[in-house]
Design a protein with these regions (language model features):
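Short, T/G/N/S-enriched strand-turn elements that build extracellular solenoid repeat scaffolds
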Residues: 1-13, 17-22, 27-42, 47-61, ...
C-alpha cells in the first residue's frame, strides 16, 4: 500500500536502525528529512525523498525508482544488490556524498533534471546510463564508470582533477554538451560521434590527461600547464 510520512524521521545522532520500504506497486513518500542507518528499497515500488537523507546507505535490493527532490541532499552511500537494477531521478540541485553502487552491481539509470540546476556526485559513480535531461551542471568529484553518459540537452559536466571517466559519451543533438576536465584525467571511451558532436571539451588545466578513443567536438580548448594526449582521431 502507499504510505506518506509528513514529519521528520529520526535526528542526527539518533538515527533509526533501518527503514524498509518500496513494496511492489506501492509509492512511499517522505515529506521531510530522514535519518536512518539503512534505507532498504526492497521491491519494485517508488520512493519519493522530498527531504534530505542522512545515514550509512540507501540499499537497492530490487528495481526500485528513487525520486530525489530539488535542493535535497543524500549524505550516505548508495548500494545495489544486483547489476542493472534501480533508477534514481534527481529533480534539481543535489549533492550525493557517498559512492553510488560499485563496478559489479551498477545502478540501471540515473536521470538528472532541473533546468540550471547544479549537482555534485562527491565520490565514485557506477551506473549503466547517466542521463542529463536539461541544461544543467553535474560535478563529478569521483570516477565515473558507465555504459553511457548521455547529454540529452546542452548540459555541462565537470570532471575533477585525478578522476577518470570510463563511459561512452553521447549527445542527442549536434553541438550540445560541454565536458570540462579540471585536471589530469583519462577518458576511456569514445566522445561524441561524427554526426552528433559535443559543443566543447576543455582540458589541460593541470596534470596529464588522455583520451583513449575517438573524440568528436565542435570545439576543443587546451588551456593551462597540463599535457593532453589523444590516442585516436580528434
Amino acid at each position: 500500500k502507499n504510505a506518506e510520512f509528513k514529519q521528520q524521521i529520526g535526528e542526527d545522532g539518533k538515527k533509526l536502525k533501518e527503514i524498509n520500504t518500496s513494496k511492489s506497486g506501492s509509492t512511499t513518500t517522505f515529506q521531510n528529512d530522514v535519518y536512518a542507518q539503512n534505507l532498504n528499497l526492497d521491491e519494485d515500488g517508488i520512493v519519493n525523498l522530498n527531504g534530505n537523507f542522512k545515514g550509512d546507505k540507501i540499499d537497492f535490493k530490487d528495481n526500485t525508482t528513487l525520486n530525489i527532490a530539488a535542493d535535497k541532499n543524500i549524505t550516505s552511500s548508495i548500494v545495489s544488490q544486483d547489476d542493472n537494477i534501480g533508477q534514481i531521478n534527481i529533480a534539481g540541485s543535489t549533492i550525493i556524498s557517498g559512492d553510488i553502487a560499485d563496478s559489479l552491481n551498477k545502478i540501471r539509470a540515473i536521470k538528472l533534471n532541473g533546468r540550471n540546476s547544479n549537482s555534485t556526485f562527491a565520490n565514485d559513480t557506477y551506473v549503466k546510463d547517466l542521463d542529463l535531461n536539461e541544461k544543467l551542471t553535474l560535478n563529478l568529484d569521483g570516477n565515473l564508470e558507465a555504459n553511457n553518459l548521455n547529454f540529452n540537452k546542452d548540459a555541462t559536466v565537470n570532471l575533477a582533477d585525478g578522476k577518470n571517466m570510463d563511459a561512452k559519451v553521447n549527445t542527442l543533438n549536434n553541438n550540445e554538451g560541454t565536458l570540462n576536465l579540471l585536471g589530469g584525467s583519462t577518458i576511456v571511451k569514445e566522445v561524441g560521434t561524427d554526426t552528433n558532436r559535443l559543443k566543447e571539451i576543455t582540458a589541460g588545466k593541470s596534470g596529464d590527461s588522455t583520451f583513449n578513443d575517438k573524440v568528436y567536438a565542435q570545439k576543443t580548448t587546451i588551456n593551462g600547464n597540463g599535457d593532453v594526449n589523444f590516442q585516436e582521431n580528434l
